[in-house]
Structure formats: C-alpha cells, structure tokens
C-alpha cells in the first residue's frame, strides 16, 4: 500500500483507497472586480498608445503556482544566502524566533534601504546591458533612433498650444479693428511669412499634432524589436539556467513559485522599458520645457505655478500611493486565496460529493469573497481620495494660472491666445501626471519582480562538471558502489556505507522497506546528487570526473510515476531521441507492446495525452515511457518500481517489455514487488541505508534472512487480502 493511503470500511460498504496526500496546487485564476478599473483601464490605454504594443508573457512551462514556503520553526529551514532568492535545504535548527526577529530588524534599519537601492541600480545596469548590445549595431541604432523620435515628439507636442494661441489671436484681431490687425502683424512678422491665413495656422496645428503622434508611433515601431528581444533573451537565459541547477535546488523550491517569478519578471521588463523609458522620462522633459517656456514668455510666476503644482502633485500622489499599497496587497491576497480555495474545491469535486459538503464549500468560499470585498472597498475609497486630491492640486494650479492670464489680458500685457496657450500647456501635463500613482506603484513592483528573476541567475548548481571532466568511455557498463555515504540532512542517514557491484550486462534488483534508500541509489547514479563520501564508478571511471551529458546520455530511466508532456504520443516517445526517424519511433513502440494500442486510437500517434499523461491509463503511460527508453537505447537501464501501481495483467505485459529492454544491458531495478526481483540475476537487500544481504533469489530464500522475511510478508499480505475478499 502506498504512503498516505488507507483502506476504509463502513457498514455494508467497502470504500477503496482514500488518498491522504495534499493535492498539488495549480495556477490560480483571477476573478478580480478591478476596483481600480477606471485608472487601470486609462493607464493601460495610455501605455498602449505610448509604448510597446505587445506585452509578451512567458507561458507556464512548469506545473504549480504555489507561493514559496514561509519560514517556520522546524528542523528544516530555508536559509537565504547572499544574492539568492531562496536558500537550499539545510539541517541546522531554526534559532529562537524572537532573536531572529530582533536581528532581522536591526539589519533592516541599518542597511535595507541602501542595499535595496544598490540592488535596483544593479538591475537597471544589467537591463541596460541587454538594451545596448555591443555586438549588435542594428539594435544600438534603434535605441538612438528611438530617443531621437522621443525628443522630436515632445518638441512638436509643445508647438501645438503655440499654434493654437496664434490662430486665436489672429482670428480675434481679424474680427476686431484695423488697428488690432496691424498690431498683430507687427508683433508676429514670422507668422505671416510662414502662414498666409488663420486657416493655414490651424492646418499647421493639425500637422503638429499628427507629427507628434507619428514620431511616437515610429519610436514604438523602432524600439519594440529591441525591447522584445531583451525580454526574450532574459527569459530564455533564466529558463536555461533553471535546467542547469541541480535537483536539490528544485526540491527546495515550489515549481509554481519559479514559474511566477519568470512570468512576472518578463512582464516587469516590458513595463520598465515602456512606462519608465517612454513615459516617465518624456514627462520630465515636457515639464522642463513647459516651465522654461512659461518663464520665458510670461515671467517667473507662471514657471513657479507649474513647478510647485507638479511638485505637490508628485509628493501627494507618491505618499497616498504608498499608503494605499497595503490595501492593494490585502485585496490581491484575498483574490489569490479565494481563487485557490475555489480551484482546490473543484479539483476535489468527487470528495465533496462523497461527503455531501457542497454547502460547506460554498460557505468557505464566501468567507474568502467577503475578505476580498472588504479589501476592494478600502482600495476603492483610497483611490477616490487620491483622485480627489490630485484634482484639487491641478485645478488650483490651473485656476491660479488662468487668473494671472486674465489680469494680464485686462492690463494689455497678454492676449486671449496666451490664455489658451497656458491652458493647453498645463492640460498637456495632466495626462501623464494622472497615471503617476500607477506608474510609481507598478515601477516599484516591477523592480521587485525583476530582482527576483535576476537573482535566479545567481543561483549556483552543486552538481557541475569538473574543469578536467572527460566523456564517459563505456566498456560494457560495469557499475560499482564503494562505501557510499549520503544524507539529505546530516541527522538522517539515507545511505550508510553501501557497497555492491552490478556486472556489465547483468540485472540487479534492489529491495527493502520504504525509506531504506532504494530510489536514492538511482538518483546518485544519474548524478542528481553527489556522495557525501565513497565512490560510484562505471567501468572504473568515477562519475564525478566524467561529463554530465555523456553520463546521462548513457543511462535510461523508467520512473515509477511516469510524467508525460501534454503533447502527442509521438512527441512523448520521440523525446527519447530527438534525432530518431518516424519509423524508429514506431519500432520502439512495438518493442514496448504499445503500438497496437496506439493504432486503435482515433488520432493514433497524434493523440494528445493530456497534462502529465492523465488521458492514458497507468499501463499505457508506462509503456510509452518504456518506448521512449527503447528509443534512447541506453547502455545502462534504471527502473524505479515501474509496475508497483499496476494490475497483475498489465504488470505481466510491462515485465515482458522490461525483460526485452534489459536484455544485454546493465540494469538496476528498484523492486516493490518481489516477483520482479526474483527474475533478476542478483538481489541487493537494503535496511536502514545498509546492504544486509546480497545474492540470487533462491540463495537468499535459503538463508532465511531479511529477504526471506520480506518474501513471506508479501505473500502473507496477498493471502490475507484474498481471504478478506472471499469473506465478503
């Protein structure tokens, strides 16, 4: 019986296995009501008009979507190393929580802000390195051209209020007295040289607006290739690096957390490039130009109004945004919790029905919805306060400027066109400033997300090639374990000085109780882990001193729990050797006794197997895995309890295929059922990480030792189960 399972009896009923293992989490969906809908939509549209058109998202290539585990006082803890997102699994006990908290607070108060700022600058420098590709002149030209279009767009944008002012003044003079028109002509000689009529000025106004928009679109078109290539390069590098990390790292991390880091990090790069480079910087340039123009044309008072209003607007927006961030976090957490609860309930649909607990599930789900509702209301109220405060600041500045303009008009120092121009310049600043809060919040979050992704690149694998590693030279496939010690945690030995030999071309079964270290032996031979001490050799070569790719290409593994890609059957078999021909794939399927079954499917080899192969039966999945290993044609075969979860008929079919696969190959079988072990040339019996017996099946039975006990126990269990079934 597998771990976490029970046989449950009830009056008149025999209920089959109840799996007590926790269900794996899957990516949560969002049902958010979007309380920031107006601001969110406006900001999204603004970014869409002024930045990269597409927002690439790296699809989930891993399976889970769970958050990283939080620290807890237990013998196992996650230790954060320098420039690491999360630490490896260590054995030291967690210190006193109070002491840890005190030390953490002391460190944070002295260096967290400066360290964070330095880390942010390092991230931006790293990103700049991807943008300014020294070995790619085309991309450097695109960056320079985009900056040129950026400046051109802002220069033309500032001309729009000027042209509108001139048109208003000209029309006002033309409808007034002759003296007014003469005065206008005398004060604007250049205008009359360029434009013949007020209509021509208005046409120029339209051309300036169109030109500004055209420059913005050209900037986007020129720069988008650079931005998208940057996202692609970083994402591919991180993805490849994750595959280069060792198994210990992946066992200490939740796969969904890694997926979310890459997904959020790639989107963060897109945001930083679009919002920061093409919106924040242009806004700063435009504010400087507008302030300078107002100071030059109308005096320092107007420049002060602009500068003070913009400064107040920024300070107020950043302060309120920082304050309301906690409400957004609470809302997002409630959203995630509700989504997780809903999905967890739905994937356990049958369990809910078995116990008639639909009402309970609905009530629990509603509790999470209530938390989301409360947090969303707080977010909405704080957003209303932010919008109202921004409106007061901007309206005050605009009204003050209009009052000064009206006084200037009454005094004869300004014209109606000047009032229109000042109004237009200030309104041009209002659009990007309206989204300052969103830009600030998203920028801070983007830097955090980018930091998490770039820190993945600083993770180092414990399993690497040595500097003088050589390819594995096979001379038959003789395997030798010599006094091997290994432990995942120092206080718990997994392998305690084991030694045995698998002769070339022979098969060895490894048996023992759960936790005795059987599967660990296969992992160490494949070099997912290195020994704490002792040596593992293949044909006399220490596997630590050979290249990983040559070692792993020589070994084929048939796991107990076969996981297939959510693709076609053909792809899953072909994955064993990507250079194989179509006919070789079919031949591998025949040897695994799965070809006829596949041929009876409506889509044959094009049948999609579903996520993790769940559309296939257990036996079909195992035979697809066998076909994949047949196609790889390794010199060494490792088989980890491949038939433990199968019925007797399917087990017999799989064993026949395994015999064919193991023929003339060095093979190691982890045997849960001793009927598998008895067919091997040699049997190694493990107990508490040590080899307690070794020899052929008949010889071990004759010794009446540990193997004989296991054999008797297994046969007795089968007899008792048969008797129980007959009693029913």
UniProtKB/Swiss-Prot annotation:
<keyword id="KW-1133">Transmembrane helix</keyword>
<dbReference type="GO" id="GO:0009941">
    <property type="term" value="C:chloroplast envelope"/>
</dbReference>
<keyword id="KW-0472">Membrane</keyword>
<keyword id="KW-0406">Ion transport</keyword>
<comment type="similarity">
    <text>Belongs to the ABC transporter superfamily. ABCB family. Heavy Metal importer (TC 3.A.1.210) subfamily.</text>
</comment>
<feature type="binding site">
    <location>
        <position position="488"/>
    </location>
    <ligand>
        <name>ATP</name>
    </ligand>
</feature>
<keyword id="KW-0809">Transit peptide</keyword>
<comment type="function">
    <text>Performs an essential function in the generation of cytoplasmic iron-sulfur proteins by mediating export of Fe/S cluster precursors synthesized by NFS1 and other mitochondrial proteins. Not required for mitochondrial and plastid Fe-S enzymes. Probably involved in the export of cyclic pyranopterin monophosphate (cPMP) from mitochondria into the cytosol. Mediates glutathione-dependent resistance to heavy metals such as cadmium and lead, as well as their transport from roots to leaves. Regulates nonprotein thiols (NPSH) and the cellular level of glutathione (GSH).</text>
</comment>
<dbReference type="InterPro" id="IPR036640">
    <property type="entry name" value="ABC1_TM_sf"/>
</dbReference>
<dbReference type="GO" id="GO:0050790">
    <property type="term" value="P:regulation of catalytic activity"/>
</dbReference>
<dbReference type="GO" id="GO:0009536">
    <property type="term" value="C:plastid"/>
</dbReference>
<protein>
    <recommendedName>
        <fullName>ABC transporter B family member 25, mitochondrial</fullName>
    </recommendedName>
</protein>
<feature type="region of interest" description="Disordered">
    <location>
        <begin position="89"/>
        <end position="113"/>
    </location>
</feature>
<feature type="transmembrane region" description="Helical">
    <location>
        <begin position="275"/>
        <end position="295"/>
    </location>
</feature>
<keyword id="KW-0067">ATP-binding</keyword>
<comment type="subunit">
    <text>Homodimer.</text>
</comment>
<keyword id="KW-0496">Mitochondrion</keyword>
<keyword id="KW-0408">Iron</keyword>
<dbReference type="InterPro" id="IPR039421">
    <property type="entry name" value="Type_1_exporter"/>
</dbReference>
<feature type="transmembrane region" description="Helical">
    <location>
        <begin position="419"/>
        <end position="439"/>
    </location>
</feature>
<dbReference type="GO" id="GO:0048364">
    <property type="term" value="P:root development"/>
</dbReference>
<dbReference type="GO" id="GO:0046686">
    <property type="term" value="P:response to cadmium ion"/>
</dbReference>
<dbReference type="InterPro" id="IPR003439">
    <property type="entry name" value="ABC_transporter-like_ATP-bd"/>
</dbReference>
<dbReference type="InterPro" id="IPR027417">
    <property type="entry name" value="P-loop_NTPase"/>
</dbReference>
<dbReference type="GO" id="GO:0051276">
    <property type="term" value="P:chromosome organization"/>
</dbReference>
<dbReference type="GO" id="GO:0006826">
    <property type="term" value="P:iron ion transport"/>
</dbReference>
<dbReference type="GO" id="GO:0009507">
    <property type="term" value="C:chloroplast"/>
</dbReference>
<dbReference type="GO" id="GO:0010380">
    <property type="term" value="P:regulation of chlorophyll biosynthetic process"/>
</dbReference>
<feature type="domain" description="ABC transmembrane type-1">
    <location>
        <begin position="143"/>
        <end position="445"/>
    </location>
</feature>
<dbReference type="GO" id="GO:0006777">
    <property type="term" value="P:Mo-molybdopterin cofactor biosynthetic process"/>
</dbReference>
<keyword id="KW-0999">Mitochondrion inner membrane</keyword>
<dbReference type="GO" id="GO:0009555">
    <property type="term" value="P:pollen development"/>
</dbReference>
<feature type="transit peptide" description="Mitochondrion">
    <location>
        <begin position="1"/>
        <end position="97"/>
    </location>
</feature>
<dbReference type="Pfam" id="PF00005">
    <property type="entry name" value="ABC_tran"/>
</dbReference>
<feature type="binding site">
    <location>
        <begin position="512"/>
        <end position="523"/>
    </location>
    <ligand>
        <name>ATP</name>
    </ligand>
</feature>
<dbReference type="GO" id="GO:0005524">
    <property type="term" value="F:ATP binding"/>
</dbReference>
<dbReference type="InterPro" id="IPR011527">
    <property type="entry name" value="ABC1_TM_dom"/>
</dbReference>
<feature type="transmembrane region" description="Helical">
    <location>
        <begin position="166"/>
        <end position="186"/>
    </location>
</feature>
<feature type="transmembrane region" description="Helical">
    <location>
        <begin position="188"/>
        <end position="208"/>
    </location>
</feature>
<keyword id="KW-0813">Transport</keyword>
<dbReference type="Pfam" id="PF00664">
    <property type="entry name" value="ABC_membrane"/>
</dbReference>
<dbReference type="GO" id="GO:0005739">
    <property type="term" value="C:mitochondrion"/>
</dbReference>
């Amino acid at each position: 019986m597998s771990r976490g399972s029970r046989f449950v009896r009830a009056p008149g009923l025999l209920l089959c296995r109840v799996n007590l293992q926790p269900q794996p989490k899957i990516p949560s969906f969002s049902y958010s009501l979007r309380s920031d809908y107006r601001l969110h939509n406006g900001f999204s549209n603004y970014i869409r008009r002024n930045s990269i058109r597409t927002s690439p998202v790296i699809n989930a290539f891993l399976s889970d979507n769970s958050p990283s585990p939080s620290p807890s006082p237990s013998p196992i803890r996650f230790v954060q190393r320098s420039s690491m997102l999360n630490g490896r699994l260590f054995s030291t006990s967690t210190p006193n929580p109070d002491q840890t908290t005190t030390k953490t607070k002391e460190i944070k108060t002295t260096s967290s802000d400066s360290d964070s700022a330095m880390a942010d600058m390092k991230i931006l420098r790293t990103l700049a390195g991807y943008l300014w590709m020294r070995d790619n002149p085309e991309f450097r030209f695109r960056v320079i051209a985009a900056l040129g279009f950026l400046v051109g767009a802002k220069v033309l944008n500032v001309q729009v209020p000027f042209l509108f002012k001139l048109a208003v003044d000209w029309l006002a003079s033309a409808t007034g007295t002759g003296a007014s028109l003469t005065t206008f002509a005398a004060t604007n000689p250049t205008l009359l040289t360029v434009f013949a009529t007020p209509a021509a000025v208005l046409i120029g106004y339209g051309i300036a607006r169109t030109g500004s928009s055209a420059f913005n679109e050209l900037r986007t078109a020129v720069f988008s290739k650079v931005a998208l290539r940057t996202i692609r390069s970083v994402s591919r590098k991180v993805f490849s690096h994750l595959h280069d990390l060792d198994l210990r790292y992946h066992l200490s991390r939740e796969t969904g957390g890694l997926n979310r880091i890459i997904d959020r990090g790639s989107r963060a790069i897109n945001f930083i490039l679009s919002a920061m480079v093409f919106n924040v910087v242009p806004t700063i340039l435009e504010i400087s130009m507008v302030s300078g123009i107002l100071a030059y044309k109308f005096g320092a008072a107007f420049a002060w109004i602009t500068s003070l209003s913009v400064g107040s607007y920024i300070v107020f927006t950043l302060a309120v945004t920082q304050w309301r961030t906690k409400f957004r976090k609470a809302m997002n957490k409630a959203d995630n919790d509700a989504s997780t609860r809903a999905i967890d309930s739905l994937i356990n649909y049958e369990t809910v029905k078995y116990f008639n607990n639909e009402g309970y599930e609905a009530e629990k789900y509603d509790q999470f919805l209530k938390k989301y509702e409360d947090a969303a209301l707080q977010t909405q109220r704080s957003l209303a306060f932010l919008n109202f405060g921004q409106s007061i600041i901007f309206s005050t500045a605009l009204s003050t400027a209009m009052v000064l303009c009206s006084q200037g008009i009454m005094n004869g120092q300004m014209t109606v066109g000047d009032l229109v121009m000042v109004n237009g310049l200030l309104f041009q600043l209002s659009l990007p400033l309206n989204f300052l809060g969103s830009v600030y919040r998203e920028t801070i979050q983007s830097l955090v997300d980018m930091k998490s992704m770039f820190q993945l690149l600083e993770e180092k694998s414990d399993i690497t090639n040595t500097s003088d590693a050589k390819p594995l030279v096979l001379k038959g496939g003789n395997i030798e374990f010599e006094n091997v010690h290994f432990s995942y945690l120092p206080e718990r030995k997994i392998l305690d000085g084991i030694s045995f030999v698998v002769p070339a071309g022979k098969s060895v079964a490894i048996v023992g109780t759960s936790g005795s270290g059987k599967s660990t032996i296969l992992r160490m031979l494949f070099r997912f882990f290195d020994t704490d001490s002792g040596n593992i050799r293949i044909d006399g070569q220490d596997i630590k001193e050979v290249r990983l790719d040559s070692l792993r290409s020589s070994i084929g593994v048939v796991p107990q729990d076969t996981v297939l890609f959510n693709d076609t059957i053909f792809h899953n078999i072909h994955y064993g050797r990507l250079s194989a021909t179509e006919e070789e794939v079919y031949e591998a399927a025949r040897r695994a006794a799965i070809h006829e079954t596949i041929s009876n499917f409506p889509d044959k080899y094009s049948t999609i197997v579903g996520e993790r192969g769940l559309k296939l039966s257990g036996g079909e999945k195992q035979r697809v895995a066998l076909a994949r290993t047949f196609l790889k044609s390794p010199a060494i075969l490792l088989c980890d309890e491949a038939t433990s979860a199968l019925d007797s008929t399917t087990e017999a079919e799989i064993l026949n295929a395994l015999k064919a696969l193991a023929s003339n190959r060095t093979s190691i079988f982890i045997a849960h059922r001793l009927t598998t072990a008895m067919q091997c040339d040699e049997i190694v019996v493990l107990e508490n990480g040590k080899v307690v017996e070794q020899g052929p099946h008949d010889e071990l039975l004759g010794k009446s030792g540990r193997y004989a006990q296991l054999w008797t126990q297994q046969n007795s269990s089968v007899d008792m189960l048969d008797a129980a079934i007959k009693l029913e």
